Swiss-Prot record:
Domain notes: The N-terminal myosin motor-like domain (MMD) does not seem to have motor activity but is indispensable for polarized cell wall synthesis via binding to actin that ensures the proper localization to the hyphal tips and septation sites near actin structures.
Protein family according to the UniProt entry: In the N-terminal section; belongs to the TRAFAC class CC myosin-kinesin ATPase superfamily. Myosin family.
Gene Ontology CC annotations of this record: cell septum; cell tip; myosin complex; plasma membrane
Function: Polymerizes chitin, a structural polymer of the cell wall and septum, by transferring the sugar moiety of UDP-GlcNAc to the non-reducing end of the growing chitin polymer. Produces a large proportion of the chitin that is not deacetylated to chitosan.
Region listing for Actin-binding, in residue ranges: 655-677
EC number(s) per entry: 2.4.1.16
InterPro entries: Chitin_synth (IPR004835), Cyt_B5-like_heme/steroid-bd (IPR001199), Cyt_B5-like_heme/steroid_sf (IPR036400), DEK_C (IPR014876), Kinesin_motor_dom_sf (IPR036961), Myosin_head_motor_dom-like (IPR001609), MYSc_Myo17 (IPR036037), Nucleotide-diphossugar_trans (IPR029044)
Annotated binding of ATP, by residue: 122-129
Name of the protein described by the UniProt record: Chitin synthase 5
Length: 1931
């Protein structure tokens, strides 16, 4: 027998500190024990080293745990051994284990009352989280109440809580199957008796970035996703729209966890939620949110159509699913992916997002939702289990180890890894100092000797990281807050740390590899600087917050979709938690401008409220243990919600706070190591282990911990507690405490490591403390009973152990829900952590309070719910959601925050809807709502209207097709007949490939037949056969008469022949198989004809009636029967057929009689009706000779006498079908011809004269770039027109930043014009187009002089910035609104109507700053922001207006500026040219151009003679300012083609006026350069053209004469637009006929096409535009696209535009119910005041002396903030010296806005205060050009510098609250009662009535109150007051 090797001496070592500690001995010991399946080794009683076995070991089972529990309870110390032997008192202990360490910590806490902390340190993948689970399992076994008692089930809840966090926070990585992606502080809370009663879990830095990162090979996302996808039941999967794991971008990985069943884990997760008391509805919400995140990850985006739109979602179905689950509208959700809201200075700005940026927002949304869900789950668990006060706690700290991504698989180290590594570095430093420094310093204080062990201290690295002044974290946070770049980061780090040993920086040359490296205690880690600062800033999208959280400010009166947030209270509640910090707009608390999800925990570790420690006194059985201190707090660590901090700084503060909380605790250490990097069991990598031992300093720790004291007591306390032991050892009480303790140490043979006696305290090792305490425990009955009951008690195992794969039965645990200590959460989904509805947490959470049913829970929304909802099946779980989804939420009653408006439909509208219903009745509504996803009724109605219009268009196109292709064949059916000449043309000589031959009236294709004949008869060459081409070969094929004709009786002799003479073809003998031949085949001819008719027949011989008459005149017996021509001439001439019998056969009399096989009556018909149609006559013979005879005779005629068919191709109906198309074509060509004639103008271009008319050059801009805007503005400035008489008016439609722009459009415009960047006037209110409260808009006004190329031109900029609470495209209301702003303003100027604040500011800037009265302007010149105008164009347009006073609008020629940019632009050049020089020139003949392009046109504002308003008339403004755009027709008119519709309105309201085309006025614009943009543009143009022309057709009195009226031209234009696809298709068909079928060339059609394009070509030839030849070729090649594909695409996409959030429901009796979420708009909320009233009042209040200025006295007791109207010249801001255009000393006019005197709402406007502005006084040096002697003198522009006071003006909307104390009525007593307007009185009366008791209110009392308010006698105004009181009370 082989001898066993002796066991190693290191195998039995359980404590490393007991060795002669060296690195080698430590490694060998660890290796020996690890190989022997002993992964645990002690460093000291308070420190443990663990080597992960990478497999499950039996020592971690419940059986092993039971041994350690027994060891804990065992307290009968039997003294053994010699008293002189050192350590004789030590108990024999089990092998080191985490169970032992955890129970020791609990023992220490239980006996001392001191709080304990167990810190687990180690690299990632070393098993720290599993050690924590085992430690908690061990502690819960000894701390739970007995089964059946209160609190006995909290152990299951603790396990459930840990498992839930593990599911949502752990992931599979390359280094760890259960990698924790967050750090945890788990606090087990105990009462004074040591019973577990609470749990607090604090998360330190959750790695939220993993959610949106597609897993690299070998890794997975968070476990919860896979559990849900793999384990959800079928019904839930269907509801949540779940697929396979591979279907989701966030989950797509190639790894499968070994030994883990995701399906089973899902069941365990649900069970854990159940054990936590979470309701079924909340579980459903959690899983629904998980599914939403998965669907979010699958969203894909496509680029926009251009710079004016953001990215769009490709998979709209997925978007709808996400929107439904998140409780928001799909349109609102899609907006956050296309638009981003940022704060630029003080204004909200919108920027467009591309596909890549949209993907970033998508991922941010997913990260935000998941991290908030994780925080909510953790906080929900804490709310459930955490105590506010308790006796003591044991905390377990598990922070991730050093993270080190290799970068080889696409991953790199960034902020996440930096923060986690900093925490590990900080924790390691704390452990080092705790082990080496704290104990030594404590011993030195007590004058005890402990040797100092040198160790590696990482304080230098930590100081470099966390130095508050200049540390790395401080630098990073500072740069992040300043939004600096990556190069700035590297530069700053290089300056500060270039010589630091813990830092190295990579060169800045390669930006992609820019990085810095930190030498951590575990080795160097390289961090990439890519997006490092941006990630550190940790800014959460405010659009996401606003979308899902909504506006929670109660004072906000603006109701929007985003203002209400998610309709799902659970989702909305996530954003109401404390870990979201938000900053609001300075003028609107409801507008979030910055947000951040904090990484700092909302809770903090508990602390001891009295900083003292006392051992727990020994109590008698049943006695209640008490102490004079409590532990708790830290449950509300929320910080200011308006402070935003960076990630690194927050994490630093959180970790620092965590470590500070450990100061008063007893610390226990676990060092978890990785025996190898391959995660293989039983493999010990010596090199890796050596590195870990060194990095953690285990050798030095083992040396230092050779002296380890775990308990510290004062001398007195020790003597009192262990007095019995002292007396037992014979140590009397009389001596001093120190002497007694020294005697005890001597008697027990203790060394200094066991007991250290200091100056004030005595220090005990854990073993000695355990010995002494066990001696006391042995006398405690409670401890004895617990030990005795241990054998009868079953351990409460962890049901969620990773090594417990079998399904755990929880049936026996059902009573857990009856336990009063477990209170289920409110079954409503509204409960969790929502703002204004925080969960109620009792201050003590005592069990007695929980059992009370008198205080119900208060859930979100104020509902009281006291019932406990049990766990439901999947059907019940989602039943409410499923039923809810089946109901159309958009067709129901208005929801919260929505407004309903009712108005009536017009009769025409109702008729149209009725027609649409008739046309589309066959499409059920549920198909549109369920299948097509059209949830809203108005969208479904628009789709039906679109379909109806398309059906009408298709019908018209069908009619055109019918006329073109079908009408001819219907009138003149196609005949396949050939005349003799046509047959002759198909001879072998003339057409060898199409040789035809005729046989008895039928024509056959000889070319195809000949090869088959050669195959059958090879001796006859094909050429011989082809010689018959073009001939009649009837004689070549003799017929057997008896086989083809039955005669009169039904049979005839077989010897009867067709002719009496044998004049057949010489080759007929080869086909003669008649009866008299030797080879008789009676049916051969019939069989051959059947075959040939089927395969080779191409038609018949054709004979016209003229031919028949000619033959009849020649004596032939020919007739027509059933359109077939028959010839019986030979039969009649021969008096029958012939006879021929074979040799030897005699003919009988019957044979002779059978020669007349045709009836005499039939023969007579041919004789006497030759050349006529005998169809009727022959049919009538049936009554005479019998129908049988007639039928047989017809057969004989068809087989023997047929000559061909009747040829009707030259009949009248056929001629009509030909010439009707010709006539229509001629009409079309004639229109082109007239257009050509109208375009012919010869002669040179004359230079226009200079004019003195004032012109406004309006430039609306949206998102154009700086280059485009500068070109446009400069071109206007350079116009050869008097600079003083033109005003450049730029309207910025919204504060939006377009693609490629680095700043918003208003900022670009102001930079171009040279406005000072510091000038920032207050926004002013005005009324815009929009739904509800969207009509209230705000804008800023800037004015000044712009100098360019020697021109100095005044400008006015109106920047529409919107109200501060607008987020998406603030201020943007569309181009039509920009036009309406100017038209409204000029209309009010003309009629002196009251104006809003913005209009008054515009008036002031134009009149008092620029110096021109706005009423002087006569023309409005409209130019788009991408258009450049020729310098002579304005003069030419004005000349046309001056030449003809009846012209109301003119336009010039617009060409393409980017013609050669792409093939798309090239194909448009010729189209632009022809559309102007043909179409517009032709329309201009009639004075009615149907579309004046908005990019280059001019309108007359008023008539020159009568001063009648024209373009600014009420009619045009009223129709054009239609605010209710809710139908398909209106949207196409007002949203897609506003310029064309504006022209339509001009023609409609002023039919006597003209619109003209001025061919010599030029401008260039930018055309679409891509197919996608072109599709978008032409879709708008084509559809708006159709709808506008449809409007024009119904207008009366359009100019013109006869059929060439404008109405006719419009009709032709409309028709040509509609049938354009048919036209192209017909041309293609003609080409196909010519090329493929070989049809004859339609010469006439070719001539017409040549005429059309030839006339067009002549236009540019006459104009010497030779370059147009190439552009014409491009255009012709693109005709299929422009005239076929684009119209078809446009027609079908007619309803493809945003419908917004406005819903339209058709009610009863023609009522329309409009439901929207924009709130109601109160026009009185925008104050109005006429300029005259305002100006007169200012004159009355000011005093002017010799040009001096005296500021007026304020009428109110409060002051407005003073701002200035921006007025600049070049780069100088207003308020600085400029060159004045004219300096006048006349009395100035001040601009001050007295808001109290404007009409306003009786209640305070919601826009007062936050949107307010200021009023200020000014003195102006005006450019009043209307009264100058010489208006052409421009010398004033170049006068020397003359300083002058600058005007100040700002009309702001800042009303004081009349109810506030600061409100003081104006002093009007010097003006009397008449100075008070009725509107002021009404406002005051409303305020009085609102605050008074109506039953006690009297008119006299109201008048007294008014007198008191205004300080004047109001008796003379009594009647007015009484009337106003009655009006107010009756409303």
């Amino acid at each position: 027998m082989a001898q066993q090797p002796p066991p190693s001496r290191f195998l039995g070592v359980t404590d490393l500190s007991s060795l002669a500690v060296t690195e080698d001995t430590v490694l060998v010991t660890l290796q020996e024990r690890y190989i022997s399946h002993k992964p645990y080794t002690s460093l000291s009683p308070a420190a443990l080293v663990f080597l992960s076995p990478y497999s499950h070991l039996p020592i971690d089972d419940e059986e092993s745990l039971l041994h350690y529990v027994e060891e804990y309870y065992q307290c009968n110390n039997e003294e053994g051994g010699s008293r002189n032997e050192q350590g004789w008192w030590k108990k024999k202990m089990e092998q080191p284990h985490v169970f032992q360490l955890a129970l020791s910590a609990y023992y220490n806490m239980r006996r001392t009352g001191q709080d304990q902390v167990i810190i687990a340190s180690g690299p990632t993948g070393s098993g720290k989280s599993e050690l924590k689970r085992l430690a908690i399992e061990a502690i819960t076994q000894v701390s739970l109440a007995n089964p059946g008692k209160k609190g006995s089930k909290i152990g299951l809840q603790v396990s459930s809580a840990e498992f839930i966090l593990k599911c949502f926070g752990n992931a599979h990585t390359l280094s760890n199957d259960e990698a924790s992606r967050f750090g945890t502080y788990t606090e087990l809370q105990f009462n004074e008796r040591g019973r577990l009663e609470g749990l607090k879990t604090i998360v330190y830095y959750f790695e939220r970035s993993r959610v949106s990162q597609a897993p690299i090979n070998g890794e997975r996302n968070f476990h919860a996703f896979y559990y849900l996808v793999s384990g959800a039941p079928e019904e839930e999967r269907n509801f949540l729209k779940l697929g396979d794991v591979s279907d989701y971008r966030y989950l797509n990985c190639r790894v499968r966890r070994v030994g883990v069943d995701d399906r089973h884990r899902y069941s365990q997760l649900r069970q854990a939620f159940k054990l936590m008391g979470i309701s079924s509805r909340l579980i459903a919400q959690i899983f629904q949110l998980l599914a939403s995140i998965l669907h979010i990850g699958n969203l894909r985006f496509s680029p926009s159509d251009g710079i004016q739109e953001g990215a769009s979602v490709i998979n709209v179905e997925t978007l709808d699913i996400v929107a439904e689950f998140l409780g928001v509208h799909s349109e609102s959700l899609a907006e956050i992916f296309s638009l981003k809201t940022v704060l630029v200075r003080k204004e909200v700005c919108t920027t467009f997002l591309g596909p890549e940026q949209a993907e970033q927002v998508r991922d941010e949304l997913a990260r935000t939702l998941y991290s908030l869900l994780f925080s909510w789950i953790n906080e929900h668990i804490n709310t459930k289990l955490c105590k506010d006060s308790f006796g003591s706690f044991i905390a377990l700290v598990d922070l991730p180890g050093i993270q080190r991504n290799s970068g080889s698989m696409g991953s790199f180290n960034s902020v996440d890894q930096f923060c986690l590594n900093f925490a590990a570095e900080k924790m390691h430093n704390w452990v080092l100092h705790r082990v080496h420094e704290t104990t030594r310093q404590e011993a030195e204080t007590e004058r005890l000797l402990i040797s100092r062990v040198p160790y590696f201290d990482n304080s230098e690295c930590l100081g470099m990281l966390s130095n508050p002044r200049g540390g790395l974290i401080s630098v990073i946070d500072d740069l992040s807050q300043k939004k600096r770049s990556e190069s700035n980061l590297l530069e700053s780090l290089g300056k500060r740390f270039h010589n630091h040993p813990s830092m190295s920086i990579s060169p800045q040359g390669n930006r992609s590899s820019a990085s810095f490296t930190i030498n951590h205690y575990d080795g160097p880690v390289t961090y990439s600087t890519s997006n490092f600062l941006e990630r550190n800033a940790n800014e959460t999208s405010t659009d996401i917050i606003q979308l899902l959280r909504g506006d929670t400010t109660s004072r906000s009166q603006v109701s929007t979709t985003e203002g209400h947030g998610s309709s799902n209270p659970f989702i909305k509640g996530l954003f109401g938690m404390k870990n979201i910090a938000m900053q609001t707009h300075p003028r609107s608390d409801s507008t979030i401008v910055a947000a951040q999800q904090s990484v700092r925990p909302v809770r903090a570790p508990s602390t001891r409220r009295k900083k003292m420690m006392s051992l727990v006194p020994v109590s008698e059985e049943g006695g209640e243990e008490t102490s004079d201190f409590q532990v708790g707090g830290g449950n509300d660590e929320s910080y200011s919600s308006k402070e935003l901090h960076c990630i690194a700084g927050q994490h630093w503060a959180a970790v620092d706070s965590l470590l500070k909380s450990f100061d008063q605790t007893q610390t226990w250490y676990i060092f978890a190591l990785r025996p190898n990097d391959s995660q293989l069991p039983s493999q010990f990598d010596l090199r890796s282990m050596k590195q870990q031992v060194r990095s953690f300093g285990l050798v030095e720790m083992a040396q230092q911990l050779q002296t380890s004291w775990e308990v510290r007591l004062s001398h007195k306390e020790a003597c009192e507690r262990y007095n019995e032991e002292l007396l037992y050892r014979g140590i009397p009480e009389g001596t001093g405490d120190v002497e007694r303790l020294r005697d005890l140490k001597r008697l027990m043979s203790l060394n200094d490591a066991d007991m250290g006696i200091g100056l004030q305290r005595v220090f005990l090792s854990h073993d000695l403390f355990r010995f002494l305490e066990d001696r006391l425990r042995a006398k405690e009955p409670g401890e004895q009973h617990a030990y005795e009951d241990l054998g009868h008690r079953k351990l409460q195992t962890d049901p969620f152990s990773p090594h417990r794969y079998q399904p755990t039965s929880f049936d026996s645990q059902d009573h857990v829900y009856k336990d009063p200590s477990i209170r289920p959460v409110d079954s409503s989904a509204n409960l969790p952590l929502m703002e204004h509805a925080q969960p109620i947490v009792n201050s003590s959470l005592e069990i007695e309070d929980r059992e009370s049913s008198a205080a119900p829970y208060v859930s979100y929304g104020g509902r009281s719910i006291t019932d406990i909802e049990g766990y439901a099946s999947s059907r019940d779980l989602l039943a409410s959601s499923i039923h809810k989804s089946e109901k159309d939420p958009l067709d129901t009653e208005p929801q919260a925050g929505e407004t309903t408006e009712v108005y009536r439909e017009s009769i025409a509208r109702r008729r149209w809807v009725w027609l649409c219903s008739i046309l589309t009745w066959w499409i059920p509504g549920f198909l549109l709502s369920k299948i097509a996803g059209m949830k809203r009724q108005d969208i479904r109605q628009a789709w039906r209207e679109k379909l109806a219009i398309n059906m009408i268009i298709w019908f018209i196109c069908g009619c055109a097709i019918f006329v073109i292709a079908i009408l001819g064949p219907v009138i003149c059916p196609t005949q396949h007949v050939y005349s003799t000449n046509e047959l002759a043309s198909h001879s072998y000589t003339l057409d060898p490939n199409n040789a035809f031959v005729a046989i008895r009236g039928e024509v056959f294709d000889l070319s195809q037949f000949a090869p088959t004949h050669l195959t059958a008869v090879s001796v006859v060459p094909t050429k011989s056969i082809m010689q018959y081409g073009g001939l009649d070969a009837s004689e070549l094929l003799p017929v057997q008469v008896s086989a083809l004709c039955g005669g009169v009786s039904g049979s005839i002799s077989q010897y009867v022949t067709l002719d009496s003479t044998n004049t057949t073809d010489v080759y007929s003998q080869y086909h003669d198989f008649r009866a008299f031949t030797n080879d008789s085949r009676p049916d051969w001819y019939a069989e051959m004809m059947i075959m040939m008719r089927h395969r080779f027949r191409v038609g018949f011989m054709g004979y016209t009636k003229k031919d028949l008459k000619k033959m009849a005149a020649q004596g032939k017996a020919v007739a027509i029967y059933d359109n077939l021509v028959y010839d019986m001439s030979n039969y009649i001439r021969q008096n029958g057929g012939g006879l021929k019998a074979p040799d030897g056969v005699n003919l009988t009399a019957q044979d002779q009689a059978d020669r007349q096989f045709m009836s005499d009556q039939v023969v007579s018909l041919f004789k006497y009706n030759s050349g006529k149609d005998i169809t009727t006559l022959l049919d009538n013979l049936g009554s005479t000779i019998g129908t049988d005879v007639v039928d047989r005779q017809k057969t004989c005629l068809r087989n023997l006498f047929i000559l061909g068919k009747l040829d009707t191709r030259d009949s009248a109906q056929c001629q009509f079908s030909t010439y009707i198309l010709l006539a229509l074509s001629c009409v079309m060509v004639a229109v082109i011809g007239f257009k050509f004639l109208s375009a012919l103008h010869f002669g040179s271009v004359r230079a226009p004269e200079s004019h003195d008319k004032f012109v406004i050059c309006q430039v609306p801009c949206y998102t154009e770039g700086e280059e485009s805007l500068r070109r446009t503005i400069d071109s206007l400035c350079k116009l050869r027109y008097d600079d003083k008489r033109k005003l450049i008016l730029v309207i910025c439609d919204g504060n939006i930043k377009g693609f490629g722009n680095d700043k918003p459009t208003p900022a670009i415009v102001l930079d171009i014009l040279g406005v000072d960047v510091n000038s920032d006037p207050e926004p002013l209110s005005f009324q815009s187009l929009g739904e509800g409260a969207k009509q209230h808009n705000m804008g800023k006004v800037y004015a000044g002089l712009y100098e360019c190329a020697g021109h100095v031109v005044p400008y006015l900029v109106v920047a529409k910035v919107g109200k501060p609470n607008e987020r998406q495209k603030p201020g943007n209301r569309g181009k039509r609104d920009s036009q309406m702003l100017v038209m409204h303003f000029l209309n009010k100027v003309h009629f002196s109507a009251p104006m809003n604040p913005l209009e008054l500011e515009m008036y002031h800037q134009i009149k008092n700053v620029i110096g021109v009265n706005p009423s002087f302007y006569e023309y409005l010149f409209m130019v788009d922001a991408d258009t450049t105008v020729d310098e002579m164009s304005l003069n030419r347009l004005v000349s046309a207006m001056r030449h003809d006073k009846k012209i109301i609008g003119v336009c010039g020629e617009t060409s393409i500026a980017n013609a050669k940019q792409s093939i798309v632009t090239m194909s448009q050049v010729y189209e632009y040219f022809i559309s102007h020089h043909l179409s517009k020139a032709f329309e201009s003949l009639f004075g009615s151009i149907t579309c004046l392009p908005g990019c280059f046109s001019m309108y007359r504002l008023r008539s020159p003679d009568t001063n009648k308003p024209l373009f600014i008339s009420h009619g045009i403004i009223q129709d054009y300012s239609e605010n209710r755009v809710d139908t398909l027709h209106l949207k196409n008119l007002l949203h897609l083609g506003e310029d064309r519709y504006l022209t339509t309105l001009v023609l409609k309201h002023f039919q006597d006026y003209k619109t003209k085309f001025v061919r010599h006025a030029y401008a260039k614009t930018v055309a679409p350069d891509s197919i996608k943009v072109l599709l978008s543009q032409r879709r708008r143009w084509i559809n708006s053209t159709v709808h506008n022309l449809a409007e024009l057709v119904f207008l009366d009195q359009l100019c013109g004469f006869c059929c060439f009226s404008m109405r006719f031209v419009v009709f032709i234009d409309l028709l040509s637009t509609i049938i354009a696809p048919v036209t192209v298709a017909y041309i293609v068909y003609l080409i196909y006929l010519i090329v493929h079928d070989g049809s004859s060339i339609p010469t006439l059609s070719i001539i017409m096409l040549a005429a059309i394009y030839g006339l067009q070509a002549m236009i540019f030839i006459f104009r010497m535009r030779w370059d147009m030849i190439a552009w014409m070729i491009f255009y012709i090649c693109a005709i299929p696209v422009f005239s076929f594909l684009l119209p078809l695409y446009s027609f079908w996409k007619m309803d493809d535009f945003s419908w917004g959030s406005t819903r339209l429901v058709v009610g009863d009796k023609g009522k329309k119910i409009v439901i929207h979420d924009e709130g109601k708009f109160d026009p009185s909320s925008i104050p109005l005041r006429s300029w005259e009233e305002y100006e007169n009042e200012l004159w009355d209040q000011e005093s002017v002396h010799s040009g001096s200025y005296m500021p007026p006295k304020a009428e109110y007791s409060y002051d407005y903030p003073r701002t200035r109207s921006t007025y600049s010249h070049g780069g100088y801001a207003y308020g600085q010296p400029i060159h004045p255009m004219q300096t006048r000393s006349t009395s100035p006019v001040s601009s001050r806005y007295q808001m109290s005197q404007f009409r306003q709402s009786p209640y305070q406007s919601p826009y007062q205060g936050p949107y307010g502005g200021s009023t200020a006084d000014f003195r102006s040096s005006r450019m009043d050009m209307a009264h100058r002697p010489s208006l052409d003198d421009t010398s004033s522009f170049h006068q020397p510098y003359q300083p002058a006071p600058r005007p100040q003006s700002s009309y702001a909307f800042n009303l004081p609250d009349p109810s506030s104390d600061s409100f003081t009525a104006p002093a009007v007593d010097y003006l009397g009662a008449q100075a008070i307007t009725d509107s002021q009185l009404e406002r005051s009366i409303r305020k009085i009535c609102a605050n008074a008791e109506l039953d006690k209110l009297t008119k006299k009392g109201v008048r007294k109150e008014l007198e008191r308010e205004y300080g004047v006698e109001l008796t003379e105004r009594r009647e007015a007051i009484n009337r106003l009181v009655e009006k107010v009370l009756t409303e």
